[in-house]
């Protein structure tokens, strides 16, 4: 029997969320916390900094290149005419107000936009500015977090109640045994979200069948959330703000494991208008750096996305896949024929390629692997796929 290849036969744990790679992350927050400023600097700075294909889907949605030193190295090494990075789809969502779940403010429109997203950049304001009024009358980001969490939970409460009522009629009173397991799972979700008043994602032990039900309904509180704290330029540079510890304490208690990333919309806006040389000088003088690359990478990872590379003299490209994707399905991202006629994936680890300096050196070191159809592709793999070309039907 042939030895098992690395990565073969490993069962991937199911992921809560929409299946696919064209996933979106929405910027959510109360009015006047800096959402549009953040969206604009995020999209414009990345578009201006790199000569990559850039696409504004509409005024409130953009594709942002994911910064990656590995991609940059491969481009410098191969110097191809075509360079295509991975992208993060970002949506600027109108400000939420208290009572949105009942239709207050933009209410239902706001919630439908969140529903179309797969993750959330939860942006809150931690700076004072007399010229920018706060919808709640004062700056208190912890209160703002709780308002948004409660609005999303209350909308889920409404959706869960409706679903249970429908299932009860069919599965319990109607005796439909096929739907009884879904009804039981919905009752467990109800206990957690309605009785315990907690978000779906705060519970980390949903089993496979429960995740199947969650993915059928895609509740608001199941979406991964990254907490972005908008500071004044001064506070961001000195890394001090009275709210940061309180925000971190709240997140650690209620959403353990979630990222809290401070940034300064004011600083990012200032940097956007500088030349590359001016920007570098300003950052060095103030001993700081832009938070945007970290935020983009975090958003991409939160959507359970990763990418592998194809690299050569004609093109270096990052191909987006879901975590846990097997080699044939990864090949299918390039072309359906690659998946249908899949033979094997020849894989190099980026680190091995960089250290060795060439494909030949990786092979000489015995680190060039041939992987079968059960191989789970890892982030940053450099892959060459071998496949059979499907035969064309003979003309009569």
UniProtKB/Swiss-Prot annotation:
Residues given in the record as ATP binding sites: 32-37, 231
Keyword Zinc attached: no
Regions that span the bilayer: none
Annotated ranges, domain TGS: 304-387
Superkingdom of the source species: Eukaryota
Gene Ontology terms, MF aspect: ATP binding; ATP hydrolysis activity; GTP binding; metal ion binding; ribosomal large subunit binding
GO CC terms in record: cytoplasm; nucleolus
Disulfide bonds: none
The keyword Cell membrane is assigned to this record: no
Cofactor(s) recorded in Swiss-Prot or TrEMBL: Mg(2+)
UniProt motif Nuclear export signal: location: 267-274
Domain OBG-type G: residue ranges: 23-283
Summary of subunit composition and partner proteins: Monomer.
Name under which the protein is recorded: Obg-like ATPase 1
Organism phylogeny: Eukaryota, Metazoa, Chordata, Craniata, Vertebrata
């Amino acid at each position: 029997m042939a030895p098992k290849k690395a990565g073969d036969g490993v069962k991937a744990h199911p992921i809560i969320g929409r299946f696919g790679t064209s996933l979106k992350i929405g910027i959510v927050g109360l009015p006047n916390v800096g959402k549009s400023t953040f969206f604009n600097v995020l999209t414009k700075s990345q578009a201006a900094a790199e000569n990559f294909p850039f696409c504004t889907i509409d005024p409130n949605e953009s594709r942002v290149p994911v910064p990656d030193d590995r991609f940059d190295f491969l481009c410098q090494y191969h110097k191809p005419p075509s360079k295509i990075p991975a992208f993060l789809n970002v949506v600027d969502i109108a400000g939420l107000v208290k009572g949105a779940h009942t239709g207050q403010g933009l209410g239902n429109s706001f919630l439908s936009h969140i529903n179309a997203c797969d993750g959330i950049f939860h942006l809150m304001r931690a700076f004072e500015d007399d010229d920018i009024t706060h919808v709640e009358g004062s700056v208190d980001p912890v209160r703002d977090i709780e308002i948004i969490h409660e609005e999303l939970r209350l909308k889920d409460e409404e959706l869960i109640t409706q679903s249970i009522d429908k299932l009860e009629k069919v599965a319990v009173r109607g005796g439909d045994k096929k739907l009884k397991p879904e009804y039981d799972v919905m009752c467990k979700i109800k206990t957690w979200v309605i009785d315990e008043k907690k978000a779906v994602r705060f519970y980390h032990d949903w089993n496979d069948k429960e995740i199947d039900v969650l993915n059928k309904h895609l509740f608001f509180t199941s979406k991964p959330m990254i907490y972005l704290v908008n500071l004044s330029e001064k506070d961001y540079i000195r890394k001090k703000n009275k709210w940061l510890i309180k925000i971190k304490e709240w997140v650690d208690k209620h959403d353990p494991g979630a990222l809290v990333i401070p940034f300064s919309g004011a600083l990012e806006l200032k940097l956007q208008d500088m030349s590359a040389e001016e920007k570098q000088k300003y950052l060095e003088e103030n001993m700081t750096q832009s938070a945007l690359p970290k935020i983009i990478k975090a958003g991409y990872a939160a959507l359970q996305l990763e990418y592998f590379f194809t690299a050569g003299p004609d093109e270096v490209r990052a191909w987006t896949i879901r975590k846990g994707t097997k080699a044939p399905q990864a090949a299918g991202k390039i072309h359906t024929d690659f998946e249908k006629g899949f033979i094997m994936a020849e894989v190099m680890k980026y680190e091995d390629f960089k250290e060795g300096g060439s494909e030949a050196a990786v092979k000489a070191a015995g680190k060039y692997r041939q992987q079968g159809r059960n191989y789970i592709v890892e982030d940053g793999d450099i892959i060459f796929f071998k496949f059979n070309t499907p035969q064309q039907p003979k003309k009569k």
